Amino acid sequence: MGGQVRVAIVGAGGRMGRTLIESAYHQEHIRLGAAIERPGSSLVGVDAGELAGVGKLNVLVMDSLDYATDDFDVLIDFTAPEASIVHLDWCVRHKKAMVIGTTGFNHAQKEQINAFAEQTPVVMAPNMSVGVNLMWKLLELAAEVMGDYTDIEIIEGHHRHKKDAPSGTALKMGEVIAKTLGRDLEKCAVYGREGITGERDRETIGFATVRAGDLVGEHTAMFADIGERLEITHKASSRMTFANGAMRAAHWLVEQKPGLYDMQQVLGLN
């Protein structure tokens, strides 16, 4: 799209919301059209730019998408599963595209998203980082070459405030590896170990989770054999990498037909 894409950001007052506002401010082809917070928030009425530390943008934080119907083309949501479903329903009814960076959806919620995406364009990805999406391609290659004769473990770490575990990114890593190897992740995943577990089953994919301090996001996939191991690691040092990816997705999405897309498609990696 040649012109600017207008975005709305829900959860504007949160850590990720403020980062998204800052990212939008610095993007040549993106313009912040609306910023939304929950009803009753003390941030309602505050200038979104001042909230994010980039100066006045003349976009005031509102407490409902209904007040911003004509102000944006794409909604960006990094909130919570229940809220994201409500926001997507709103987007369908008002013919708006949506970028979803929320993680932690259950099976029923994913089915709802699939159904809604038949009516409006949606990008949903557990991680919007370019580096992470490239990592998933590297995992396919590693699994293809080494997966059948190595022990596979996925280790991830995030800040103390993250609510879901393992992270959506870690689960996606497992899905990529399992699919490449022809395995069912639901049957081969092992989430943490405790007590006398017995000898490791080569067919399993292990997950370990760390929650500590202000870790932005660290993910490692380990392919371990006797005598050597391969580790593929991505470390995010700032939420800005996720925010910039979301803006890239929004700019790409506005010209797409209804459907459910991911960052691999946005980045042309498929």
From Swiss-Prot:
GO molecular function (one): NAD binding
Record's catalysed reaction(s): (S)-2,3,4,5-tetrahydrodipicolinate + NAD(+) + H2O = (2S,4S)-4-hydroxy-2,3,4,5-tetrahydrodipicolinate + NADH + H(+); (S)-2,3,4,5-tetrahydrodipicolinate + NADP(+) + H2O = (2S,4S)-4-hydroxy-2,3,4,5-tetrahydrodipicolinate + NADPH + H(+)
GO cellular component: cytosol
Pathway, per record: Amino-acid biosynthesis; L-lysine biosynthesis via DAP pathway; (S)-tetrahydrodipicolinate from L-aspartate: step 4/4
InterPro entries per UniProt: DapB_C (IPR022663), DapB_N (IPR000846), DapB_N_CS (IPR022664), DHDPR_bac (IPR023940), NAD(P)-bd_dom_sf (IPR036291)
Gene3D superfamilies to which the protein is assigned, alphabetical: Dihydrodipicolinate Reductase, domain 2 (3.30.360.10), NAD(P)-binding Rossmann-like Domain (3.40.50.720)
One GO-annotated biological process of the protein: diaminopimelate biosynthetic process
Localization in the cell: Cytoplasm
Residues that, per the record, bind NAD(+): G11, A12, G13, G14, R15, M16, E37, G101, T102, T103, A125, P126, N127, M128
Keyword NADP: yes
Binding site for NADP(+): R38
Alphabetical UniProt keywords: Amino-acid biosynthesis, Cytoplasm, Diaminopimelate biosynthesis, Lysine biosynthesis, NAD, NADP, Oxidoreductase
A Pfam family assignment: DapB_N
Entry annotation: catalytic residues: H158, K162
Similarity annotation: Belongs to the DapB family.
HAMAP family: DapB
Protein name in UniProt: 4-hydroxy-tetrahydrodipicolinate reductase
Organism (species): Shewanella sp. (strain MR-4)
